[in-house]
């Protein structure tokens, strides 16, 4: 849903800001885990947007 995609995009933004502010305190392993989370959240948003675009193109 739009609400879910919006929430996931906001989560990516918050996580990214946390990395910017605290990058010196994050070790390589944690950074790898965080990158995986960002990838998952952002890909979910991208898939939703592409699906919606496809639906609108069919109308």
Regions found by a protein language model. Give the residues of each.
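Sequence/structural signature of long amphipathic alpha-helices
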Residues: 1-59
């Amino acid at each position: 849903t739009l609400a879910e995609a919006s929430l996931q995009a906001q989560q990516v933004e918050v996580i990214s800001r946390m990395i910017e502010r605290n990058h010196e305190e994050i070790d390589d392993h944690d950074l790898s885990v965080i990158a995986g989370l960002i990838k998952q959240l952002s890909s979910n948003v991208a898939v939703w947007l592409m699906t919606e675009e496809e639906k609108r193109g069919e109308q």
